């Protein structure tokens, strides 16, 4: 499996619950290296642009409202099979259906406030990463085992 990058977002509910460090620790434990990270409060335009693929869906306005309701943590994660690994760690979109030990099972309230976002494909990961991070803001490095 190839080394790849994926976008991860700790959503406003995850920030509000104070689980940022726990979420990042789970990624690192699974071999996903944060190579870019920032906390920001998305504007309506940023959220609408990012989720434009869902514009015709009935949940679009609620999603944008939620994603602009508080700060988020944006991250680029790098590692072998990063997209699939991130999705496995996050768990099912609906926390009620998520496996035990996943981020959503452990921290999410419901399908709307499900704590994290992760790219769903390598192709979308490239688009999503570039939406929030110019290449100059991404810093790859080698892990030295402790």
From Swiss-Prot:
Binding site for ATP: 11, 59, 87, 93, 104, 114
EC number: 2.7.4.6
Keywords: ATP-binding, Cytoplasm, Kinase, Magnesium, Metal-binding, Nucleotide metabolism, Nucleotide-binding, Phosphoprotein, Transferase
Intracellular or extracellular location(s): Cytoplasm
Principal subcellular localization: cytoplasm
GO cellular component, one term: cytoplasm
Protein's UniProt keywords contain Kinase: yes
Pfam families the record matches: NDK
GO MF annotations in UniProt: ATP binding; metal ion binding; nucleoside diphosphate kinase activity
Alphabetized CDD domains for the sequence: NDPk_I
The protein's required cofactors: Mg(2+)
SUPFAM superfamilies membership: Nucleoside diphosphate kinase, NDK
Catalytic activity as recorded in UniProt: a 2'-deoxyribonucleoside 5'-diphosphate + ATP = a 2'-deoxyribonucleoside 5'-triphosphate + ADP; a ribonucleoside 5'-diphosphate + ATP = a ribonucleoside 5'-triphosphate + ADP
Residues of the active site: 117
Keyword check for Transferase: yes
BP GO annotations: CTP biosynthetic process; GTP biosynthetic process; UTP biosynthetic process
Class of this enzyme: transferase
Extent of the signal sequence: none
InterPro entries: NDK-like_dom, NDK-like_dom_sf, Nucleoside_diP_kinase
SMART domains per the UniProt record, alphabetical: NDK
Family: Belongs to the NDK family.
Subunit structure, interactors included: Homotetramer.
Function: Major role in the synthesis of nucleoside triphosphates other than ATP. The ATP gamma phosphate is transferred to the NDP beta phosphate via a ping-pong mechanism, using a phosphorylated active-site intermediate.
Name of the protein in question: Nucleoside diphosphate kinase
Gene source species: Anaeromyxobacter sp. (strain Fw109-5)
